[in-house]
Amino acid sequence: MKFHYQKTGRVTIGWVAMSEVEITVGATIAYKLSKCPLISCPQLNVIAQYVHNALHGMSEITFATAKCHADDKYDERKGEQIVRTKIYRRVNKLTCRLFEKCCREIIIDLKGRVISVTHE
């Protein structure tokens, strides 16, 4: 996974891309991955680490630091997994998209609700 910053303000780290939504200090962003059995908990921890690194690396741009973890509970019945990102300093604008291995784009809001799923 490569860290990539564009002057448009979008960051792409492997499956994760971020651009612009307002969050406040102390907010927790939950990335909810629905019906994606190919994504295991170790992979989610990798995603969480890359989100952390991206926010840390962009701190001079976004004034953001974050600690991330992946929930180790995987609900087989619902087929979903959650990654949470805790924001400790102010973030001007941030939104998150997670891309999983099936060429599917999942757009999640700040409360962890799936907004849309795109199949290629």
What is the predicted function of each stretch?
Residues 1-120:
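Catalytic phosphate/metal-binding cores of nucleic-acid and nucleotide-processing enzymes, i.e., regions
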